[in-house]
Swiss-Prot record:
Family of this protein: Belongs to the TrpA family.
Keyword terms, alphabetized: Amino-acid biosynthesis, Aromatic amino acid biosynthesis, Lyase, Tryptophan biosynthesis
Gene that specifies this protein: trpA
Entry annotated with the keyword Cytoplasm: no
Name used for this protein in its record: Tryptophan synthase alpha chain
Uppermost EC category: lyase
Reaction catalysis annotation: (1S,2R)-1-C-(indol-3-yl)glycerol 3-phosphate + L-serine = D-glyceraldehyde 3-phosphate + L-tryptophan + H2O
Active site: E49, D60
Species name: Ralstonia nicotianae (strain ATCC BAA-1114 / GMI1000) (Ralstonia solanacearum)
Purpose of the protein: The alpha subunit is responsible for the aldol cleavage of indoleglycerol phosphate to indole and glyceraldehyde 3-phosphate.
Gene3D superfamilies: Aldolase class I
GO cellular component, one term: cytosol
Top-level taxonomy: Bacteria, Pseudomonadati, Pseudomonadota, Betaproteobacteria, Burkholderiales
InterPro entries named in the record: Aldolase_TIM (IPR013785), RibuloseP-bd_barrel (IPR011060), Trp_synthase_alpha_AS (IPR018204), Trp_synthase_suA (IPR002028)
Length: 265
């Protein structure tokens, strides 16, 4: 059983919801990335999504775009991201880490070489935002062969056929995008999310995490009422953007602890 599957199995047995925060690797301070990952766990995260900086992050709103730009300006590439995971794994053997990003950096490294390097570093899952449906099956097969869960997005616009296809190739969890548009976009519609998740579950037996538009404890708790996990990205990246170097780790721990408390209430 993969670390991700094990984590969700334990959460289910405890009657708890998963908390999946996202940070951009190398932002805002490259030397703090591993400390921030540990801060997420201390606050109560169950899975960490670590963003791989990319120059054209088309699914991301301005907050995460700026984070990518700052990290790239500091020369944070895919190999450095894998180094962060390796350093995190030196002291945390249990918290799953999912790399989230775009196809280009992976294809530049080579998919087979990436799968091997990511597995050796201790990566548990990979979510590539821009793989078209016709390419995702081969990619998923390569990842699974390396012991990495291929994670895919579904959106309000996803067809039943797309859901069925993703159900065939995905493992770990399914990331449901609660809004049309980019990360950090406007208010989400809880009723539409609540209606959509049972449709996804008709096709896939995997846990469903919901992200995009979750900015505070109240929204997280509401989403936790209908989904298996809550994914929070833009709000965290914004907090880190605004925090000083000295405050960043504590600020992140406190924010995650508030969300965790709301989910467990």
């Amino acid at each position: 059983m993969s670390r991700i599957a094990q984590t969700f199995s334990q959460l289910s047995a405890q009657g708890r919801k998963g908390l999946i925060p996202f940070i951009t690797a190398g932002d805002p301070y490259p030397e703090l990335t591993v400390d921030l990952m540990h801060a997420l766990v201390k606050g109560g995260a169950n899975v960490i999504e670590l963003g791989v900086p990319f120059s054209d992050p088309m699914a991301d709103g301005p907050v995460i775009q700026r984070a990518s730009e700052r990290a790239l300006a500091k020369k944070i590439g895919l190999r450095t991201v894998l180094d962060y995971v390796r350093a995190f794994r030196a002291t945390d053997k249990t918290t799953p880490v999912v790399l989230m990003g775009y196809a280009n950096p992976i294809e530049r490294m080579g998919i087979d070489a990436f799968a091997k390097a990511a597995s050796e570093a201790g990566v548990d899952g990979v979510l590539v935002v821009d793989y078209p449906p016709e390419e995702c099956e081969a990619f998923a097969k390569t990842m699974r062969a390396a012991g990495i869960d291929p994670i895919f997005l579904l959106a309000p616009t996803s067809t039943e056929a797309r859901m069925a296809q993703i159900a065939r190739v995905a493992s770990g969890y399914i990331y449901y995008v609660s809004l049309k548009g980019v990360t950090g976009a406007a208010t989400l519609d809880l009723d539409s999310v609540a209606a959509r998740i049972p449709q996804i579950r008709q096709h896939a037996r995997l846990p469903v995490g919901v992200g995009f538009g979750i900015r505070d404890a109240a929204t997280a708790r509401a989403i936790g009422g209908v989904a298996d996990a809550v994914v929070i990205g833009s709000r965290i990246v914004q907090l880190l953007e605004e925090a000083s170097r000295e405050q960043a780790v504590q600020c992140l721990t406190d924010f995650i602890a508030d969300i965790r408390q709301a989910l467990d209430a």
